[in-house]
Structure formats: structure tokens, C-alpha cells
Amino acid sequence: MAKSRFEYVKQFERENFLLPDTYLIVRVDGKGFHKFSEEYEFSKPNDIRALKVMNNAAKNLMAQFPDIMMAYGDSDEYSFLLRRKCSLFERREMKLVSTFASFISVNYLYEWNLEFPEKQIRLERLPTFDARIVVYPTIKHIRDYFSWRQVDCHINNLYNTTFWTLVIKGGMTGREAENKLLGTVSSDKNEMLFKEFGINYNNESEIFKKGTILVREYDYTREGDDLSKRQQQRVEKQRKKASIEEYHLDIIGDTFWNERPWLLE
């Protein structure tokens, strides 16, 4: 940047450098996607093609930044886990948040055009995302965070599945369906689906019930201070070349995490 007498204005800029040696989770969320889904006539209660667009945009982000170890997505939301030793953008909060939000926004549009060539995106209703970042100090916090998001996915999907079944198959208005579901718990909704419509919720697709987990999979070598510089470089190279695999399974129990210890290094 050229020197000038006006450069003093940079003194007003402030950077928030996030705590070192802590886990970072960046969560991106669609802005106004309720209206967006109505505008472009998403299938109800779930649009598998729209989920594919979101999942592919998230994969593109992971491919761009090897420090992202895993991601969890549901609907128009995605959470990205950055490894504890991550130094991406010097851990500057504003840089991370703005980059993730803009990257997902443009990649969502790119993937949309591939998946929905028959649905032209209009200027009046563009897909945009905001982002936030949270610092977590322990493995327990990370696991509890992703458990929270997956439980939320289940609760929302069961409600939406029941709501739209009442509307589409039961002939109710949206207000009538809301009133019928008012005060119900999960067992009530399951019983309603099965007794009134012959739908066993357990047979619904796992992607809808459990969301999408993206994982950087590679031959694991434990990182640590005892590794030589060459060994550390080899591990970093493996991480960059790692395949990004998609799963729809339980991440609340121990199995998923025990099989992938590198995620929480």
C-alpha cells in the first residue's frame, strides 16, 4: 500500500486474533432462506437437490482450506471445524468470517446453476449467507456442539415431515397443521405419521434425519511436538491431499469419533 499523509486512518482498524491452541468452529447460515425456498419452489418437506447444492458448496470450501477437518450440514446451515493448530489468516476473526460467508455464497450460486439449470436465479432473490465463529477450548465442547446441531436437525426434520404430511396428504392449511402439532412431543408426531398416513419415520432417508457430515479422510499419523520438521510437512501434505467423504450417520455416540482421532488433534 502506498504511503501517504492519509494513512493514519488505518489506526482506527481493529483486528480480533482468536486464541491460539483452541478449536474454531465457523457456522454459515442462509439469509432469508424461508422466502428463498418459496421463491424457487423447493420440494417439501425436503428438497434433495437443494441439499446437494449446499453439500457441494461446503465440499468446495473444505477443498480450498485443508485446515478444515470436518463439517456438519443441515438445510441451509453448515458448521466447519478448524483444527486446533490452525493458523489460517493468522486466526483473524473478521477475515475468517467474511471469507467463509462469501465463499459459500458464490459457490452455492455456482452449484445451483449446475443442479438447477431450469431455475434461473433472479437478482431480487439471491442466495446469501452470514457467518459466525466460536472458540472452543476442549474436545468435550466440540463433541457437544456437533451433538447439539444433529439433535436440532432431528427435531426440525420430524416437525417439518409431520407438518407437510398434514398439509400435502391430510389437506390441512398451514395454520391448521400448526395448531394440530402445538404441544406435541416426538412420540406424538411419530404416532400421527404412522396411524394417520402409514409413514414410519424410521424409514425416512438418513440425510434428512441426521444431516450431512463431511470428513477429511487420510492415513492418520499422530501430530505432535515429537515429530521432525519433515514428518510434520508430510502430515500437512497428507491433509491437503485427503479425500473429502460424505456421511449421514450418528455423531452423538463415540463410534464416529473413535474411528477418526485426527479430527480432534
Curated annotation (Swiss-Prot):
<feature type="binding site">
    <location>
        <position position="76"/>
    </location>
    <ligand>
        <name>Mg(2+) 1</name>
    </ligand>
</feature>
<feature type="binding site">
    <location>
        <begin position="75"/>
        <end position="76"/>
    </location>
    <ligand>
        <name>GTP</name>
    </ligand>
</feature>
<comment type="function">
    <text>Adds a GMP to the 5'-end of tRNA(His) after transcription and RNase P cleavage.</text>
</comment>
<dbReference type="InterPro" id="IPR024956">
    <property type="entry name" value="tRNAHis_GuaTrfase_cat"/>
</dbReference>
<dbReference type="GO" id="GO:0000287">
    <property type="term" value="F:magnesium ion binding"/>
</dbReference>
<keyword id="KW-0342">GTP-binding</keyword>
<keyword id="KW-0547">Nucleotide-binding</keyword>
<keyword id="KW-0460">Magnesium</keyword>
<keyword id="KW-0548">Nucleotidyltransferase</keyword>
<dbReference type="Pfam" id="PF04446">
    <property type="entry name" value="Thg1"/>
</dbReference>
<dbReference type="InterPro" id="IPR025845">
    <property type="entry name" value="Thg1_C_dom"/>
</dbReference>
<keyword id="KW-0808">Transferase</keyword>
<dbReference type="Pfam" id="PF14413">
    <property type="entry name" value="Thg1C"/>
</dbReference>
<dbReference type="GO" id="GO:0005525">
    <property type="term" value="F:GTP binding"/>
</dbReference>
<feature type="binding site">
    <location>
        <position position="30"/>
    </location>
    <ligand>
        <name>Mg(2+) 1</name>
    </ligand>
</feature>
<protein>
    <recommendedName>
        <fullName>tRNA(His) guanylyltransferase</fullName>
        <ecNumber>2.7.7.79</ecNumber>
    </recommendedName>
</protein>
<comment type="similarity">
    <text>Belongs to the tRNA(His) guanylyltransferase family.</text>
</comment>
<dbReference type="GO" id="GO:0006400">
    <property type="term" value="P:tRNA modification"/>
</dbReference>
<keyword id="KW-0819">tRNA processing</keyword>
<dbReference type="GO" id="GO:0008193">
    <property type="term" value="F:tRNA guanylyltransferase activity"/>
</dbReference>
<feature type="binding site">
    <location>
        <begin position="29"/>
        <end position="34"/>
    </location>
    <ligand>
        <name>GTP</name>
    </ligand>
</feature>
<keyword id="KW-0479">Metal-binding</keyword>
<dbReference type="GO" id="GO:0008033">
    <property type="term" value="P:tRNA processing"/>
</dbReference>
<dbReference type="InterPro" id="IPR038469">
    <property type="entry name" value="tRNAHis_GuaTrfase_Thg1_sf"/>
</dbReference>
<feature type="binding site">
    <location>
        <position position="29"/>
    </location>
    <ligand>
        <name>Mg(2+) 1</name>
    </ligand>
</feature>
<dbReference type="InterPro" id="IPR007537">
    <property type="entry name" value="tRNAHis_GuaTrfase_Thg1"/>
</dbReference>
<feature type="binding site">
    <location>
        <position position="29"/>
    </location>
    <ligand>
        <name>Mg(2+) 2</name>
    </ligand>
</feature>
<feature type="binding site">
    <location>
        <position position="76"/>
    </location>
    <ligand>
        <name>Mg(2+) 2</name>
    </ligand>
</feature>
